[in-house]
Amino acid sequence: LPYITTSNLYWDRFELGNLREMYFSENEIEKCTATKGDLLVCEGGDIGRAAIWMFDEDIRIQNHIHKLRSYTEVCTEFFYYLFYLYKHAGWIGGKGIGIQGLSANALHALLFPLPPLSEQKRIVSKIKESEPLMEKYADVEKYLDKLNTEFPDQLRKSILQEAVQGKLVP
């Protein structure tokens, strides 16, 4: 049966072009099967990276991927965004006192806020509403970083050009 590994799991998406296959016993099938709506989280590789399985077809997962299935009072997308926050804040997979790996025990030890379901959905809606602005900000930040990196070299070249042309002497 085909299965996904951490190399197929990215933030909010899956790369399914290179699925591996292996035999799963009847005992392993339930534990290793993700269904639509499950939040899948990397234990290794890019620790904490997560995506929601949104396909109608079930898929098997390797043992380095955690499967989180929500209950009725939990919005899976809310927990996806919490994992994104925890990862980028360095609380999982970070340096120092952050969790270095994400074993099942480490995952169970994480504390998550759990507002009422309606509030979880409202938070998710606000995040989705602001995502285009965040993406635009990220693009501008990359451009600014590029300018800041290139500026000293461009300034040096410009000064040399002015000096060669004799424009620096009054």
What is each stretch, according to the model?
Residues 43, 59-66, 96-117:
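A short glycine-rich beta-alpha junction/loop motif
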Residues 75, 79, 106-142:
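Amphipathic alpha-helical segments
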Residues 1-2, 7-36:
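Sequence-specific dsDNA recognition surfaces
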